[in-house]
Regions:
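Short, surface-exposed secondary-structure boundary micro-motifs
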Residues: 87, 169, 281, 363-365
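A short beta-sheet element
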Residues: 46-47, 57-127, 264-324, 338
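Sequence-specific dsDNA recognition surfaces
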Residues: 20-33, 48-78, 222-233, 242-272
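A generic structural signal for residues embedded in beta-strands
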Residues: 83-84, 172, 178, 277-278, ...
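Short coil/turn segments at secondary-structure boundaries
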Residues: 32-39, 59, 136, 234-240, ...
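Non-catalytic DNA-recognition/assembly elements of restriction-modification systems
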Residues: 4-29, 152, 207-231, 346, ...
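Short amphipathic coiled-coil heptad-repeat segments
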Residues: 1-11, 172, 177-218, 373-394
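A short glycine-rich beta-alpha junction/loop motif
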Residues: 3, 85, 100-107, 130, ...
């Protein structure tokens, strides 16, 4: 057996083996709860801390003291890979001698020396093995992958030289994705910085003739926009936008449905320039600026905002921190905080003249366009990698 896509200098069949045969030890973290210490320096990690090949520590990561850490014997080395096996399944990370304590949702795989560690890391991402692992999951609410399944995982493996060649090639693809992701993060940070400067009026534009624009005026949202305008009769068929359809300003899902099959929440008939504001969990900021042709209807989970001002400026103003903080202050509920249309409409916004609105909207739109281009490049690179993983492994 050998893969569809192969470097020409290699031939011969790959060998069927198991992960256990290629490892010195496979185990998981502690099943007990350690004694947490807010002033502790050692992170207690779980599967969610395994991100894109590294251990990612965040503000929610529990910590323990050095004394607590000494109670547990973890046999890890530079030959160790981590795999998440409980709750979050399939996350991977290299161990780089960080001082961390493993929770039970982290499986450690100590590989033998005659293997390319990066090859095994990539192999475990392949569609073939991902499908196999997912088929072996147990549990209903919280999924679990047993250590026995991990140990007995079967796959075909080439000689070490071919492993290294494959790993080197695919690592270059990963590096490209990483560079694009970093660029995306930096542009997103730049946009946030620009929004802060623009909406705090730290940065002001001038009119085309060089004159100063008038001072901004404070107005309630309902005074500058119509909230949830009454819709005419809905069309017999339309594209439905619900709360799952939009993520960070991007329309990801377009569901074409018939009126007779439409959910009761399908009520907001959209017109170009409308802004959709997410009223449930608004901190997610999955709002949408609608500028498409055709029949679209949105869920009542959104507030539909229609204005005669620059609607793109209003869209950005709804993402400004001061506005969002006020929205959250008026929300009710804990797990799913929500604001009603009446409370939303009474929140005040600082409004410049129309010409300055347009200048601000144009600057932020230009940044968004660059971010979208990079997002598409990242997605294309990920799809390319997925195709390579499909063809370069058995």
């Amino acid at each position: 057996m050998f893969p569809k896509l192969r470097f020409k200098e290699f031939d011969g069949d790959w060998t069927l083996t198991t992960l256990n045969q290629l490892s010195t030890k496979i185990g998981d973290g502690i099943h007990a709860t350690p004694k947490y210490d807010e002033s502790g320096t050692i992170p207690f990690i779980n599967g969610n801390n395994l991100v894109n090949g590294r251990i990612a520590i965040n503000e929610n990561t529990k910590r323990i003291s050095s004394e607590e850490f000494q109670k547990y014997n973890q046999i890890l080395s530079d030959r160790t890979l981590f795999l998440s096996i409980n709750g979050t399944i399939g996350n991977l990370a290299f161990y780089k001698n960080e001082k961390v304590l493993l929770g039970k949702s982290v499986c450690f795989i100590n590989l033998k020396n005659d293997l390319d560690k990066k090859f095994i890391y990539l192999l475990l991402q392949s569609p073939q093995l991902t499908k196999t692992l997912n088929s072996e999951l147990t549990g209903t609410t919280i999924k679990n992958l047993s250590l026995a399944t991990v140990r007995n995982l079967e796959f075909y493996c080439p000689i070490e030289a071919e492993q290294t060649k494959i790993a080197s090639f695919l690592s270059a693809v990963d590096e490209k994705i990483s560079q694009l992701t970093k660029k995306h993060e930096l542009l997103s940070q730049y946009k946030q910085g620009m929004m802060q400067k623009l909406f705090s009026q730290q940065l002001r534009f001038k009119a085309d003739d060089g004159s100063e624009f008038r001072e901004w005026e404070e107005k309630e949202l309902k005074d500058i926009a119509e909230i949830n305008p009454k819709s005419k009769k809905l069309p017999e068929s339309f594209i439905y936008i619900d709360l799952e359809s939009v993520e960070k300003g991007q329309l990801l899902l377009q569901k074409n449905i018939e009126l007779q099959d439409a959910p009761s929440r399908a009520q907001r008939l959209l017109a170009k320039g409308d802004v959709l504001f997410q009223m449930v969990r608004p901190y997610q900021q999955n709002n949408y600026y609608f500028n498409l042709s055709g029949e679209y209807v949105a869920s009542t989970g959104y507030a539909q905002i229609r204005t005669k001002l620059d609607s793109k400026f209003i869209y950005y103003a709804l993402h400004e921190k001061t506005f969002l903080d006020e929205v959250m202050n008026r929300c009710t509920g804990t797990s799913y905080p929500a604001i009603n249309s009446s409370d939303l409409s009474s929140i005040e916004i600082l409004i410049p003249c129309l010409e300055e609105q347009t200048k601000i909207a144009n600057v932020l739109s230009a940044i968004d366009q660059k971010i979208e281009v990079i997002s598409k490049q990242i997605e294309q690179a990920k799809q390319w990698k997925k195709g390579l993983l499909q063809q370069m492994f058995i």
